[in-house]
């Protein structure tokens, strides 16, 4: 299959709104509002693998930086209307960890109750919180499963399964 390298802004694949200034001005950061699921599905049906960079636009010509996990989650949610989708978040760790200093302390499965408890205990913090929030939003939108893992372990079935 061919690889189609694009950003969310290309071909109007994704439209975002500039994040409003509240306590913090995030600058040119976009929150995804719309995904062209039919176009993404059409590319896949043509044997094209879309690779999306985390840049979107606001329909007024402004490019916006968008969280990469959000781009992946929004694309997965849109594609779940056309396909059975597994969303895989790949990053430098082997999965969600009980101890951020112990790479072997991978939590094999995590549900919403455990997630909330780990956040309250300070075990899950920082960037892992929005990653898991994106995972649960994807599941709620029909994504079959979400796996958080290291890219090197993607085909080994390792990591954390989110449900």
Regions inferred by a protein language model and the residue ranges of each:
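C-terminal catalytic "cap/lid" subdomain
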Residues: 1, 5-163
């Amino acid at each position: 299959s061919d690889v189609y390298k694009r950003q969310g802004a290309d071909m109007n694949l994704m439209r975002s709104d500039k994040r409003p200034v509240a306590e913090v001005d995030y600058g040119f950061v976009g929150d995804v509002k719309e995904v062209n699921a039919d176009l993404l599905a059409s590319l896949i049906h043509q044997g094209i693998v879309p690779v999306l960079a985390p840049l979107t636009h606001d329909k007024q010509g402004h490019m916006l930086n968008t969280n990469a996990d959000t781009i992946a989650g929004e694309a997965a949610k849109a594609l779940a209307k056309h396909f059975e989708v597994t969303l895989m978040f790949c990053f430098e760790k082997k999965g969600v960890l009980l101890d951020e200093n112990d790479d072997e302390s991978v939590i094999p499965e995590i549900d919403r109750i455990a997630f909330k408890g780990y956040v309250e205990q300070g075990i899950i913090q920082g960037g892992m919180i929005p990653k898991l929030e994106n995972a649960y939003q994807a599941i709620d939108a029909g994504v079959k499963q979400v796996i958080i893992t290291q890219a090197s372990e993607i085909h080994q079935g390792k990591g954390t399964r989110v449900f």
